[in-house]
UniProtKB/Swiss-Prot annotation:
Pfam family, one: Copine
Predominant location category: cytoplasm
Protein keywords: Calcium, Cell membrane, Cytoplasm, Membrane, Metal-binding, Nucleus, Repeat
Protein name: Copine-7
Length: 557
């Protein structure tokens, strides 16, 4: 066994937008020995290249006095198939506390690669190189990648032990516990290593969290192996005992007894001693299973996506009778409004059982009094603004154009507030049954920016998302304010949005894209936003709602 740190180890996270998530596990062999009296105390730093610069993002724990360390800390990174993501792993002999600073540490070697290379190989071993490309002796680093995008949550575990064997002459043992997953090929993968509890035969280790994928590859009957050691500062830890179990067994025992325990057995002692029973007892004091639901979990659980379309009828679009107008109807060439409307609508309608769209307009003078309206039904039925399918919206739009006078200004806050009222009514049901998408199609920057920011911040607490597609060639720079990608959107009063619910897309950047590519870009953020909302509200998919009551309290949060 390799060395151990004196601290518990928790997963590290590289912050990034939602994508396929990959866990990286690290180990090294034959490291250089930089310490004259003992072995090196290695740790690994992860760097990621961004805009040509190497940025240090995380670091493993320190493994004491080991030239062949197996690190417990896991790096979680986001993987994009379409991009080249350059990573660098640097190994240091660590002096003092392990933080993100390496200036006092001895460099033992580094390795550069791409995340794609690691993912393609799943397990990659490379030599470590010193400065100027020189080999660091026989030193190697191994990186194992696991896709956790489909994981189904994480578990909190809390272990303690009783009456462990005393391995020390002048004091009591300093125990720590290691939890391993047994892989299909029989190999063992370190999942977690607890902190060391000094001078104690009845240790209580700190609770820890681990993903189900890391723990058991989401297979609850997969064998798990727990080993208990007496810590030695020189890395020569004394084996106390072990036991084998499964996550399913843990759950069953914990639910029945509110506590599960196993004999911690040293096989060598069992063979030699006739009356040997165990080297102590390990107790699972707490188990909490936290299910993490995906977008598809909610959709398949019965959550409906209701889409509202809001179309800009301001005068800046140009007279629809003029072929240069953004609203000009050409039977052979759909205008930008229609292209965006159809591309997004055809995707959304698959998630709504009645396939009905609310279709609204803003910025026009409407009959019969031709007063300016910033919230009117384009079918001119204020009692029922819904249209049958996306084709119904197209027909209502084409029929509406000759009947209205394009005017202004470009105010969208009233429509955002209208959809927010529907979403608020849905929120009060306490179920994950309906999520609202507002698609705003506009040819210019909104003129009621303060009111719009206020409306979006309020809406960020509700089950809704806002997608804004900018059509035409206007300067949409100011619209990026509403998209929270560059920082948290705030209301004029300074209140921050709870979630980033706005996606802004200039249509001209996708003018030559296929409808599928356009829809993919426009709707890219929606699945994440749906999951974020229901996760924040701690609402499971409707089909799982019955499992969240007190009956499941022993194995659910």
């Amino acid at each position: 066994m390799s060395g151990d740190s004196e601290r518990a180890v928790a997963p590290g996270v590289v912050p990034a937008p939602c994508a396929s998530k990959v866990e990286l596990r690290l180990s090294c062999r034959h490291l250089l020995d930089r310490d004259p009296l003992t072995k090196s105390d290695p740790s690994v730093v992860l760097l990621q290249q961004a805009q040509g610069q190497w940025l240090q993002v995380d670091r493993t724990e320190v493994v004491k006095s080991s030239l062949h360390p197996v690190f417990s800390k896991v790096f979680t990174v986001d993987y994009y198939f379409e991009g080249v993501q350059k990573l660098r792993f640097e190994v240091y002999d660590t002096h003092g506390p392990s933080g993100l600073t390496c200036q006092d540490d001895d460099f033992l070697g580094g390795m550069e690669c791409t995340l794609g290379q690691i993912v393609a190989q799943k397990k990659m071993t490379r030599p470590l190189l010193l400065r100027f490309g020189r080999n660091a002796g026989k030193s190697t680093i191994t990186v194992i990648a696991e896709d956790i995008s489909g994981n189904n949550g994480y578990v909190e575990l809390s272990f303690q032990a009783r009456k462990l064997d005393d391995k020390d002459l002048f004091s009591k043992s300093d125990p720590f516990l290691e939890l391993y997953r047994v892989n299909d090929d029989g190999s063992e993968q370190l999942v977690y290593r607890t902190e060391v509890v000094k001078n104690n035969l009845n240790p209580v280790w700190e609770p820890f969290k681990v993903s189900l994928n890391s723990l058991c590859s989401c297979e609850e009957t997969r064998p798990l192996k727990c080993l208990v050691w007496d810590y030695d500062s020189r890395g020569k830890h004394d084996f106390i005992g072990d036991f084998t179990t499964t996550f399913a067994e843990m759950q069953k025992a914990f639910e029945e007894e509110q506590q599960a325990q196993w004999d911690c057995v040293n096989a060598k002692y069992k063979q030699k001693k006739r009356n040997y029973k165990n080297s102590g007892v390990v107790i699972l004091a707490d188990l909490k299973l936290h299910r993490v639901h995906s977008f598809l979990d909610y959709i398949m659980g019965g959550c409906q996506i209701h889409c509202t379309v809001a179309i800009d009828f301001t005068a800046s679009n140009g007279d629809p009778r003029n072929s240069c107008s953004l609203h000009h109807i050409n039977p052979y060439q759909p205008n930008e409004y229609l292209r965006a409307l159809v591309a997004v609508g055809e995707v959304c309608q698959d998630y709504d059982s009645d396939k009905r769209f609310s279709a609204l307009g803003f910025g026009a003078r409407i009959p019969p009094k031709y007063e300016v309206s910033h919230d009117f039904a384009i079918n001119f039925n204020p009692e029922d603004d819904e249209c049958e399918g996306i084709q119904g919206v197209v027909e209502a739009y084409q029929n509406c154009l000759p009947k209205v006078q394009l005017y202004g200004p470009t105010n969208v806050a009233p429509i955002i507030s209208k959809v927010a009222r529907m979403a608020a009514a849905e929120e009060s049901t306490g179920e994950a049954s309906q999520y609202y998408i507002l698609l705003i199609l506009t040819d210019g920057v909104v003129t009621d920016m303060s009111d719009t920011r206020e409306a979006i911040v309020r809406a960020s607490h509700l089950p809704m998302s806002v997608i804004i597609v900018g059509v035409g060639n206007a300067d949409f720079t100011d619209m990026q304010i509403l998209d929270g990608d560059d920082g948290v959107l705030r209301s004029p009063r300074g209140e921050p949005a709870l979630r980033d619910i706005v996606q802004f897309v200039p249509f001209r950047e996708l003018k030559n894209a296929s409808p599928a590519a356009l829809a993919k870009c426009v709707l890219a953020e929606v699945p994440k936003q749906v999951v974020e909302y229901y996760s924040h509200k701690e609402l499971p998919p409707r089909s799982l709602g019955a499992q969240t009551g007190e009956a499941a309290a022993s194995s659910a949060p």
